[in-house]
Amino acid sequence: IVIEDTNLKLPGILSYLMTYVGTIPLIKSTSYIANKFPKHLYDALENNNWVLIFPEQEMWWNYRKPRKLRRGAYYFAAEQNVPIVSTFIEIQPLPKLEKDHPDFYQTKYIVHVLPTIYPDVSLNAHDNSKQMMEKDYQKKVAAYEQIYGKKLNYDFTPWDIAGWRNKANLPK
């Protein structure tokens, strides 16, 4: 799992897990990303390990819509000639309230594994990464529209945050 280096400073057992379960830290330094980070990825992939990167850079809690993707993960995949396993996470609200957050219902997550995206060896890493990123985004949009039965648009509605007990989300 590629994680921001700040996650290594989490309290207690989380810090231990983040440090010792084979995570690859991501440090916001051009020098690190250009020199050390690719070596960490290469080493992991050479040992037949999978690498998990969230290409949208950050997760928004319970946000249902696919986010615009960032090209970095696709660039490294293209550069190392490895596929992208595309996924879409469906979020469904449950009837029970969150224990510590009464403004939210509990939710469940369903991971949909979409068709794998392979690099095109005839393209350079830059063009390949753009093509892979676009294919992945289109797969995520298609999954969203099929699962939720609605066309994707980015106008915000309270429904976009799964489980939110906003008045607009409550039954009439």
What are these regions (language model features)?
Residues I1-S31:
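Catalytic core of membrane glycerolipid acyltransferases/transacylases, capturing the structured
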Residues N35-K172:
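Non-catalytic C-terminal accessory region of glycerolipid acyltransferases
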